[in-house]
Amino acid sequence: HYLEHEFDGSVPENLALVMIPGDLVSEGGEYYQWKEHFFDPAQDLFSEVPVYPVIGNHERNSTYYFKYFSLPKNGSPEHDEHWWYKDYGNVRIIGMDTNEEYQNRTQLSWLDDVLAKTKENEEIDFVFAQMHHPHKSELWLAGEEDYTGQIVKKLEAFSTETGKPSIHFFGHTHGYSRG
């Protein structure tokens, strides 16, 4: 509806990509939701720009999520599309899986390695990190995750050390907050 209202149904020329921090559908195991609630409404947009989602608790290990998205396969070998990174111009986009069963040292060690490589990469000036569960939320305190706090701490330390800003995107609360 936003594109129809703001841009007469057209995709703006300066829209380079779409990032979605999880909860793409209500029930990830239901095919009709992917078609009717996700792909059909966004068909015009998704046909013109790349889409980089991370998995939320509503998609949790849905075979449809992994079937419909071809995400970078540069995460840990056993979970390569659960966490990943993609370079887009001078931005490194990092996708993390903050669902409970993937809150582990393997993912945090992988992030350490990616941030070390990013520090050395002179072509990368910014990091956009997206994950589903927020560390802090003014909208839903029960949805906060300490694990995400560990990720945010690593990203903030990276930015302080390198001067390369990291911007963090979260889902789960289904709302906007700046807190």
Residue ranges and their predicted role:
Residues 22-23, 56-57, 132, 171-172:
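Active-site glycine-centered loops adjacent to acidic/histidine catalytic or metal-binding residues
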Residues 32-123, 141-161, 167, 173-179:
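Extended active-site neighborhood of metal-dependent phosphoesterases/phosphodiesterases
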Residues 20-25, 118-140:
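Short acidic, glycine-rich surface-loop motifs adjacent to enzyme active sites
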Residues 16, 125-127, 166:
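Conserved acidic residues
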Residues 1, 17, 90-100, 128-132:
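Active-site-proximal beta-strand elements of phosphoester/diester hydrolases
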Residues 18-20, 53, 129, 169:
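Residue-level marker for buried hydrophobic side chains located in beta-strands
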Residues 25-26, 59, 135, 175:
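Short active-site segment of divalent metal-dependent hydrolases/proteases
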Residues 1-31:
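N-terminal active-site segment of His-dependent metallophosphoesterases
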